[in-house]
């Protein structure tokens, strides 16, 4: 009994030590693309593992689904993460092994394997510990004790074999095997039963009971798994056979009807069946026995093709070694029937004709040359043509790949973007690979094909052309789903390409480029030559990033669900930039060219230590304390959402150490002085913020004029100047800019030496209850006194990187100033609200740590009291005294921890109140923007203002939800009766946790000594 108490305390300590993991922040904004990520629903009724299979589970297994997901680092809704956690899977598996027997165990484990396979987990899909797996295997062979052991099974003889035997010959002897194979399963069974009426009902019942195949759980239309792009959840024969059956030689078709029940796969899961040697071996042995020569090559090529399309790695179709040997021997054998040989050659001729007709560069349209090409293709070509999808073929509706190509699957998608020197290199022979000529992903992973292209490019191109070709190759292979390094070039070819990339092109190509560029520029935009040309040249010279090739609308790559093929900064930075601390934002502009990733590929950039290390080192250098924690948490969050595995954001060890050190450092005194300067009198604000006003105004102008292109606001002397709103701890500020007569025509808004006045007042509050006042009458009249319209310059960069500078004429000056001023107030309030959210999240995280210490203290107190009771019974006064001392220390630590919990709860309440008031500020400012926009009579201004109103409303809705969450935390945290502690609870809670750890060490030594002593005494 006593040793078990020691073990429980040790386990509790391990749990408390691991509870310091910072969870990735959750986002619920409607415009956040992650909230509609297609393959993971962010909620669950039970948990992400149980929800989708609960209704199909046996009754005995259903109570086992309600296990605690808190023992894992996974979100409770994340199916894939829960599947690979042995702690969670083991708890469910142990429960099933205990409560279920026989077929119920098989059904439950098959469903678990199925849902984990659908979620994208690798073999063995559901990660159950070995001892639990043994228990499940034993339970699966046990006989159920229930009296409901199916009477129907015993009363109905096993007609399953009879049904299978009767259906197989019928399909083989049929004059139209393709139609039979593509019909529905129910149709086939009905035809068989009509031929053998006596055994129809037993066969149907027995096959249902004896089969170990569990079909995929049915799901409603709004479940994202029902639109999972690459796997159809049904099959006529099975997931392997359906898509290639019509293209198989006649001798191989009967081999497709193997039993999928010998695998843990759902019968429709192509990828799972491809990697199961038991299933692949049965098919391969049958083909080796029934087929010879070219028929074996065709069948194995089709098998490799379908497995490659399903995303399986090399060698794609996992056939056992002995079966592979049999297939190789059969492929070299000569068919015994001359009729079979003639039939095979005619099919090959038809295949070669279709391939030739799709090649644009060939001149085989004349009748005489067609006959010769047929003959040569029969003798030399070992390429298996792409399956022709027809109206009766099931593959025409389930495939996610285009089964044809003009050149080949690799070249088609990038040919138009290639430099001229590289285009001839694309016409390499795909016959040296086992790939279908149209399969981009398969061709990407074949070194012999990639090496031929790479060697040709290295010989034909130099300098920037090499970089463009390799970037395009990497891009198209990444889009095709190939893992890093995407385009599998041999090492020797990579070296040749690297050397060629550093070489300087000859003068002929340089002069040709120089002669083409000016004429092209002058013909497009004569009035903007000066601003376009430098931007174009610099972007072409400095950028090594090549965007993904554009593809037609019917190409499935254009609707690839989880990756946007463009980015403003890069795929890592775009989605978290607005939430980052200011100190970390400059760190996002690292060069993606040091990686093989497309610049827009979030997941790829997350796993590249060179890119992640550069960002991490910059953050460690520029940020301190909570800013470091926020930045790294956002990085982990975006990488987790992109599907990267733990630890999500792959930082090098030395950079991680630097970030840990920076996270514990205290921010410098600059921030304190900045706060102090912001709280000075209103008369000093214009002089202190004149430089900042210009920058803020430029941002306001950019936001007031929406466009499809990105807007780059650069501070200049002729930009409008509107000051940003003061922070919540300032006493109020009034900025009075004006404009002199000398520069009234060139400035968008007044500077400090002009004559007009625009004022804005913000009332301070302890919780940030700031309110915005409408511009006064005198302000409007002063702004209206400006004669005539004013102008401002707007700098726009389009998608091609060309910079335009346009002039905006502002006629409603007063309303324009009101709108930009209100936009600045809303922007400031939004930033302060984000800061309050961060403060709340930090306090919540610290509260979890302290509550963990409280729980540990309570557990330790109970254990020591038990030891003390035993010592009192044994009259061991020394042990009793030691226990009393430890109980006093632990009680003191628990009391301090409870005070800290109360303090952290108050901090969170304060942060929520602050966010609520700032949401009101945003709403008020948005109303001012909308009113001013309507007064301007500008549709663009109204659209921007309406967006601001929507954002302000959304901010208020989010705050309401968070208040409910905080209220629940307070009630569960036992707020009543706890005295108020200091608000700066960060250091205090860490001290409490450290003290608890120290007490744990001393208590453990006391407990071990006491247990040994009491045990010897007894």
UniProtKB/Swiss-Prot annotation:
Chain ranges of the CFEM domain: 32-143, 223-334, 393-504, 555-666
Matching PANTHER family: CELL WALL PROTEIN 1, GPI-ANCHORED PROTEIN 10
Localization in the cell: Secreted, Cell wall; Membrane
Keywords: Cell wall, Disulfide bond, Glycoprotein, GPI-anchor, Heme, Iron, Lipoprotein, Membrane, Metal-binding, Repeat, Secreted, Signal, Virulence
Protein purpose: Heme-binding protein involved in heme-iron utilization. The ability to acquire iron from host tissues is a major virulence factor of pathogenic microorganisms. Required for biofilm formation.
GO biological process: intracellular iron ion homeostasis; single-species biofilm formation on inanimate substrate
Principal location class: secreted
Posttranslational modification: The GPI-anchor is attached to the protein in the endoplasmic reticulum and serves to target the protein to the cell surface. There, the glucosamine-inositol phospholipid moiety is cleaved off and the GPI-modified mannoprotein is covalently attached via its lipidless GPI glycan remnant to the 1,6-beta-glucan of the outer cell wall layer.
Record-given protein name: Cell wall protein 1
Biased composition, class Polar residues, residue ranges: 148-164, 767-785
Alphabetical list of InterPro entries matching this protein: Extracellular_membr_CFEM_dom (IPR008427), Fungal_Heme-Binding_RBT5 (IPR052505)
Gene Ontology terms: cellular component: cell surface; cellular bud; extracellular region; fungal-type cell wall; hyphal cell wall; plasma membrane; side of membrane
S-S bridge residues: 60-100, 64-95, 74-81, 83-116, 251-291, 255-286, 265-272, 274-307, 421-461, 425-456, 435-442, 444-477, 583-623, 587-618, 597-604, 606-639
Family: Belongs to the RBT5 family.
Region (Disordered): 147-227, 338-396, 507-557, 677-785
One MF annotation (Gene Ontology) recorded for this entry: metal ion binding
Signal peptide: 1-17
Segments of skewed composition (Low complexity): 165-221, 509-553, 690-766
Membrane topology reported for the UniProt record: Lipid-anchor; GPI-anchor
Alphabetized SMART domains for the sequence: CFEM
UniProt comment concerning the protein's domains: The CFEM domain is involved in heme-binding. It contains 8 cysteines and is found in proteins from several pathogenic fungi, including both human and plant pathogens.
Lipidation, GPI-anchor amidated serine type: 989
Glycosylation, residue list: 698, 708, 718, 729, 743, 753, 769, 798, 965
Expression triggers: Preferentially expressed during the mycelial growth phase with only low levels of transcript detected in the yeast form. Induced by iron starvation and ciclopirox. Positively regulated by BCR1 and RIM101, and repressed by TUP1. Expression is also regulated by EFG1, CPH1, HAP43, and SEF1.
Binding site for heme: 78, 269, 439, 601
Residue ranges of the propeptide: 990-1018
Originating gene: CSA1
């Amino acid at each position: 009994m006593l040793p078990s108490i020691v073990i429980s305390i040790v386990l509790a300590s391990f749990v408390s030590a691991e509870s310091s993991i910072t969870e990735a922040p959750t986002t619920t904004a409607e415009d956040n693309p992650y909230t509609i990520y297609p393959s993971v629903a962010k909620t669950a009724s039970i948990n992400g593992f149980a929800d989708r299979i609960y209704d199909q589970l046996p009754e005995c297994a259903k109570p086992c689904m309600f296990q605690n997901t808190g023992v894992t680092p996974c979100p409770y809704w994340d199916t894939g993460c829960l599947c690979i956690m042995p702690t969670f899977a083991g708890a469910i598996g142990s429960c099933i092994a205990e409560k279920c027997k026989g077929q119920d165990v098989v059904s439950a484990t098959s469903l678990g394997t199925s849902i984990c396979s659908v979620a994208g987990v690798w073999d063995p899909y559901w990660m159950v510990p070995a001892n639990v797996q043994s228990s499940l295997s034993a339970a699966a062979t046990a006989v159920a004790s229930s009296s409901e052991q199916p009477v129907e099974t015993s009363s109905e003889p096993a007609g399953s074999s009879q049904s299978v035997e009767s259906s197989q010959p019928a399909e083989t002897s049929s004059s139209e095997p393709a139609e039979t194979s593509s019909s529905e399963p129910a149709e086939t069974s009905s035809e068989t039963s009509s031929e053998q009426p006596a055994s129809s009902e037993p066969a149907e019942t027995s096959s249902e009971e004896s089969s170990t195949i569990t079909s995929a759980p049915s799901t409603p239309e709004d479940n994202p798994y029902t639109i999972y792009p690459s796997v159809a959840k049904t099959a006529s024969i099975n997931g392997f056979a359906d898509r290639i059956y019509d293209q198989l030689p006649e001798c191989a078709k009967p081999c497709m009807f193997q039993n999928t029940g010998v695998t843990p796969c759902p019968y429709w899961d192509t990828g799972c069946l491809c990697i199961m040697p038991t299933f692949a071996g049965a098919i391969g042995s049958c083909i080796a026995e029934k087929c010879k020569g070219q028929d074996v090559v065709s069948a194995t090529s089709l098998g490799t093709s379908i497995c490659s399309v399903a995303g399986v790695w090399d060698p794609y179709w996992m056939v056992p070694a002995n079966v592979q040997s049999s297939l190789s021997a059969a492929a070299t054998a000569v068919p015994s029937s001359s009729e079979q040989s003639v039939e095979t050659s005619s099919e090959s001729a038809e295949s070669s004709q279709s391939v030739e007709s799709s090649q644009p560069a060939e001149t085989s349209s004349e009748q005489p040359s067609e006959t010769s090409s047929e003959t040569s293709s029969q003798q030399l070509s070992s390429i298996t043509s792409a399956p022709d999808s027809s109206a009766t073929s099931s593959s025409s509706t389930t495939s996610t790949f285009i089964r044809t190509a003009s050149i080949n699957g690799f070249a088609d998608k990038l040919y138009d973007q290639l430099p001229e020197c590289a285009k001839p290199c694309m016409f390499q022979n795909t016959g040296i690979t086992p790939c279908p000529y149209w399969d981009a992903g398969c061709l990407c992973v074949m070194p012999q094909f990639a090496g031929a292209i790479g060697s040709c490019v290295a010989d034909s191109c130099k300098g920037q052309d090499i970089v463009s070709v390799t970037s395009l190759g990497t891009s198209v292979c990444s889009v095709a789903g190939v893992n890093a390094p995407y385009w599998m070039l041999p090492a020797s070819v990579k070296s040749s390409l690297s050397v060629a990339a550093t070489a300087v092109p000859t003068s002929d190509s340089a002069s040709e480029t120089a002669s083409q560029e000016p004429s092209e520029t002058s013909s497009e935009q004569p009035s903007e030559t000066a601003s376009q040309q430098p931007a174009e040249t610099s972007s072409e010279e400095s950028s090594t990033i090549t965007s993904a090739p554009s593809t037609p609308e019917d190409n499935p790559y254009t609707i690839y669900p989880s990756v946007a093929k463009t980015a403003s900064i890069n795929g890592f930075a775009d989605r978290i930039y607005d939430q980052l601390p200011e100190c970390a934002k400059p760190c996002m502009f690292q060069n993606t060219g040091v990686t093989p990733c497309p610049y827009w590929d979030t997941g790829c950039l997350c796993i590249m230590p060179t890119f992640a290390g550069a960002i991490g080192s910059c953050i460690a250098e520029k940020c301190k304390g909570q800013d470091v924690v926020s930045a790294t948490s956002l990085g982990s969050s975006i990488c987790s959402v992109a599907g990267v595995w733990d630890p999500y954001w792959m930082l090098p060890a030395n950079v991680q150490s630097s970030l840990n050190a920076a996270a514990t450092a205290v921010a410098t005194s600059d921030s304190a002085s900045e706060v102090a300067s912001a709280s000075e009198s209103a008369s000093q604000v214009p002089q202190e913020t004149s430089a900042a006003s210009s920058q803020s105004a430029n941002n306001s102008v950019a936001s007031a004029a929406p466009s499809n292109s990105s807007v780059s606001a650069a501070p200049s002397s002729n930009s409008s100047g509107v000051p940003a709103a003061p922070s919540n701890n300032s006493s109020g500020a009034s900025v009075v800019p004006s404009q002199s007569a000398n520069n009234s025509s060139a400035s968008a808004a007044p500077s400090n030496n002009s004559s007009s006045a625009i004022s804005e007042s913000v009332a301070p509050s302890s919780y940030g209850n700031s309110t915005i006042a409408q511009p006064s009458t005198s302000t409007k009249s002063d702004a209206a006194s400006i004669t005539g319209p004013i102008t401002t310059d707007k700098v726009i960069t389009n998608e091609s990187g060309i910079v335009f500078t346009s002039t905006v004429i502002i006629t409603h000056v007063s309303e324009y100033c009101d709108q930009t001023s209100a936009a600045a107030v809303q922007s400031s309030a939004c930033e302060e609200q984000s800061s309050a959210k961060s403060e709340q999240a930090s306090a919540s995280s610290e509260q979890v740590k302290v509550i963990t210490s409280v729980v540990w203290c309570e557990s330790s107190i109970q254990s020591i009291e038990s030891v003390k009771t035993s010592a009192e019974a044994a009259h061991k006064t020394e042990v009793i005294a030691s226990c009393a001392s430890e109980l006093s220390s632990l009680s003191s630590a628990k009391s301090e921890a409870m005070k800290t919990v109360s303090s952290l709860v108050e901090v969170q309440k304060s942060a929520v109140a602050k966010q609520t008031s700032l949401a009101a500020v945003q709403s008020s400012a948005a109303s001012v923007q909308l009113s001013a926009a309507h007064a301007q009579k500008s549709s663009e201004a109204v659209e921007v203002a309406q967006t601001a109103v929507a954002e302000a409303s959304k901010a208020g809705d989010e705050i309401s939800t968070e208040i409910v969450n905080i209220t629940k935390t307070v009630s569960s945290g036992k707020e009543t009766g706890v005295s108020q502690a200091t608000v700066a609870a960060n250091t205090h809670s860490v001290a409490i946790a450290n003290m608890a750890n120290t007490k744990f060490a001393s208590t453990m030594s006391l407990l071990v000594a006491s247990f040994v002593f009491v045990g010897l005494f007894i």
